[in-house]
Amino acid sequence: MSHPFDLTGRTILVTGATSGLGRQTAISVSEMGAQVVINGRNEERLADTFSKLEGEGHLAVSADLAVGETRSAFVNKLPPLDGIAHCAGVTLLHPFKFNDERQFREVYAANVEAPFFVTQGVFKSKRLKPGASIVFVSSISPHAGLKGHAIYAGSKAALHGISRVLAHELAGSKIRSNCVSPGMVRTEVVAGFAHQVSPELVAIDEARYPLGYGTPDDVANAIIFFLAPASKWITGVDLTMDGGRT
């Protein structure tokens, strides 16, 4: 009997694999036996992630998925998939009264349009196998109402709705769709946040997390759960991961 978290023989697409959660997810998924297709915009960092993958048969495809024409070409390069981990995305910390249309379009193109139309393209081209699993990486921002996150939180809330609908529309093909919604995780983004504000403010924010900030491993392990047979009876779920913050 195979282990319920074993991904051997499965092919998983991981977007945003050049850094942070996407990078760790790609590495962790390969450690569980999967063949991984990794995507990111920076070819050098993508190659570095590729060098860290365990096993053989992996594929790296550099592309900016926020651009429609690029998405179509990207989908055409993909093999049949057993799962997708949508880890790519951008953040924006900016007061509501100063938000503009350019910011809105850029954030929604990366955080909503890219995962939506990549998933649609993969499904319509029959590259998403029956029984596959889709995982969207959202955020606690829609739940927490964090100041300065109006555009970002809206984009991540959209993923909740999309995932929930896909859970019903794709159930006939036994394709599952779920979200993971992390709080602050110790990635390059958090390090940049500390420089943007101050280490003292970061410490104050972390104190709001009963279990402290998370690590990329924490989120990657949850994504593996949703990609693996262990969660075969779970779909349409949004898993909040924030160490008790909300």
Language-model-detected regions and their locations in the chain:
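Alpha-helical segment proximal to the catalytic Tyr-Lys
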Residues: 124, 168-172, 232
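Substrate-binding pocket helix/loop in short-chain dehydrogenase/reductase
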Residues: 95-96, 100-108, 201, 205
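Conserved glycine-rich cofactor-binding loop
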Residues: 18-19
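Active-site helix of classical SDR
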Residues: 119, 155, 163
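A conserved structural motif in NAD(P)-dependent oxidoreductases
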Residues: 208-219
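Short C-terminal tail/terminal secondary-structure segment
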Residues: 2-3, 144, 224, 235-246
